[in-house]
Amino acid sequence: WDVPLPLPELWEAVKWAVKPEGAVLFFAQCPYDKVLGASNLAMLRYEWVWYKSRCTGFLNARRAPLKKTENILVFYQKSPVYFPQFEQGKPYKKIHRCSGNSPNYGKFERTSGESDGQRFPGNVLAFPTVTTTVHPTQKPVALCEYLIRTYTRPGEVVADVCAGSGTTAVAALNTGRRFVCFETAPAFYGPATERIRRAREAVASGRKGE
């Protein structure tokens, strides 16, 4: 988490291990997110922005703004499955007042629209920051669940090459996905393994892992 990934080797491994329709997501902050995105512009598609409940970067507060967001870069070779997680808004019925002629769209007739209040998601995701952590950059389980539901079907495999505290594995268990996780740091491997074990037990008993 504190050492940049070797990008050429990373992308070689991604193309070998991930099917062309698989989505590849990375959490990253400036300036590394720019380096990461530029390292594979052919696969870079767009980004989500995680809006945190707590700021970070207090040691640099007199030199730079506190960090309230973190970017999530999305890469893929071919379009992956995409299941937008709809947000609930206010239902409405709308009728255009009259027919007309637009220089951009030509002639149009009076039409009506109706919505049950469901809205397509924007790219800013507000999830509370984890307060009690195993890993310094631990992500919220709910945020990882959101991303897993967006890009995978139940029963599919989710992989995390920087597993840290095991949040991705817990989120995969909670959403009915399988997982493959990698972590090389002994300080995190043990606690993550125990956390995943507890999550398995929770899911097996009808609860959610934490």
Give the positions of each predicted feature.
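Core catalytic lobe of class I
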Residues: W1-P191
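Short, conserved SAM-binding/catalytic segment
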Residues: T193-G206
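Acidic, low-complexity intrinsically disordered tails
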Residues: G209-E210
